[in-house]
Amino acid sequence: MTHDWCHRHAGSLRIAVHVQPGARVSEVVGESGDALKIRLQAPPVDGKANEALIVFISEKLGVRQRDVRLLRGQTSRQKLLEIESGLSVEEVRARLL
């Protein structure tokens, strides 16, 4: 089954994620439909979960935090991230799954 939660768009990468804030530990759970499912320790208060997501993704992918941007979903569990990186879609999938 092919999921398109990660794709190239105009020279950058876009990743669709489904976030579960307030978890015991931050981790990638797997694929959920057309999104990557991620549990985060941070609570969904005052943008803390969004900040934690950017830190988590940047560490997993080995990119700078400023290269990860939240495009959509500031107040939703469904989010779209844009990553400025030379990584391929296959490399991103390998590092996150």
What are these regions (language model features)?
Residues M1-V55, V63-Q65, R69-Q74, K79-L97:
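Contiguous, often N-terminal, cationic amphipathic patches that form binding interfaces
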Residues E59:
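Alpha-helical residues within the helix-turn-helix
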